[in-house]
């Protein structure tokens, strides 16, 4: 017998299957290969003092405050950590996705204020909008890493 309860069950089953299948797919725009990223930033450390103000950023790499290879990003180009709101941080790989897709070149973007620019292809990426390209040939955003904030510490990871 088919009643309202069985139609709802079928609908819920379809929704669950669709969600589980879509969550397994790699993001189409994530063209930079995965590397291990896992580090903490202490906002009381003078090296990261700029992150105490909304709209500021810091560049993190292997040598930053002895964070090591887990703060290197792809091909040791480093990671941009940007404070977008009081309790929200955005972490982006500095590798230009356009140059990587084109020929496998690994070029670190330069950061000035709220924009990052590739010195090779001249694509510009907006930090407040999660590294979305705003000009130039790039069709891909900068690779983004997960962040969490606990009041004093910002955790950046791809786990």
Explain the meaning of each model-derived region.
Residues 6-8, 71, 76, 116, ...:
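Polar low-complexity intrinsically disordered regions enriched in Ser/Thr and small residues
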Residues 1-3, 53, 129:
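Intrinsically disordered, low-complexity segments enriched in small/polar residues
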Residues 1-8, 13-44:
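Bacterial Sec-dependent N-terminal signal peptides
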Residues 11-13, 84-85, 119, 135:
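Generic detector of short alpha-helix boundary/capping microenvironments
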Residues 27-111, 126-127, 143-159:
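N-terminal pre-ligand scaffold of iron-sulfur
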Residues 110-121, 132-145:
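Short cysteine/histidine-rich metal-coordination sites, predominantly Zn2+-binding motifs
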Residues 22, 94, 116-119:
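Extracellular secreted precursors and ectodomains with disulfide-bonded cysteine-rich loops/domains
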């Amino acid at each position: 017998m088919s009643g309202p309860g069985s139609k709802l069950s079928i609908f819920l089953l379809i929704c669950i299957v669709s969600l589980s299948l879509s969550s397994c797919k790699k993001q189409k725009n994530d063209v930079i290969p995965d590397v291990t990223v896992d580090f903490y930033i202490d906002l009381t450390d003078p090296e990261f003092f700029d992150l105490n103000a909304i709209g500021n950023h810091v560049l993190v790499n292997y040598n930053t405050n002895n964070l090591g290879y887990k703060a290197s990003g792809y091909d040791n180009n480093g990671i941009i950590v940007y404070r977008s709101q009081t309790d929200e941080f955005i972490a982006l790989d500095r590798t230009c996705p356009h140059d990587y897709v084109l020929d496998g070149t690994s070029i670190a973007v330069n950061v000035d204020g709220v924009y990052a620019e590739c010195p090779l292809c001249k694509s510009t990426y907006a930090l407040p909008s999660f590294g979305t390209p705003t000009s130039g040939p790039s069709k891909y955003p900068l690779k983004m890493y997960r962040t969490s904030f606990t009041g004093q510490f910002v955790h950046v990871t791809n786990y």
